[in-house]
Amino acid sequence: MNRPRIFADFHNADAKGRLRLNCIGTIEDLSRQRIELHDGQLLTLYSEELEVDGAVQYSEAEKVWVATIDWDQIRHVEEYIVQARS
C-alpha cells in the first residue's frame, strides 16, 4: 500500500509514545503534498535514515496531531536502498 511519506521527529513523542506531528519538517511535507490529517490516516514517517508506518490520531489533551507507531518496527532506510541496488 502506498502511504504518504512525511517527516517526523522521532525524539518528539508524547507520554504514550506517539509521535507529535507538529515540527516544521512535518508541516512542510504535509503542505507540499497537500495532505490534511484525519483520524485513522496511514502514513510512513521518516527522519534521516529511519522510517516507520503509523496511524494518525488527534490528541485532545495536547491539541495536536500525533501518529501511533510500533517502535519495534522502525526500519533503517539505507538498508532498503542497498537492497534495491543489488
Residue positions per predicted region:
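Short, basic/aromatic beta-hairpin or loop at an interaction surface
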Residues: 6-25
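Glycine- and charge-enriched low-complexity intrinsically disordered segments
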Residues: 2-3, 61-86
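Short alpha-helix capping/helix-loop boundary micro-motifs
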Residues: 23-33
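Short beta-strand-centered aromatic/proline hotspots
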Residues: 50-61
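Short, well-ordered loop/turn sites that connect or cap secondary structure elements
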Residues: 36-38
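Short, charged beta-turn/beta-strand-edge "cap" motif at the junction between a beta-strand
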Residues: 42, 46-52
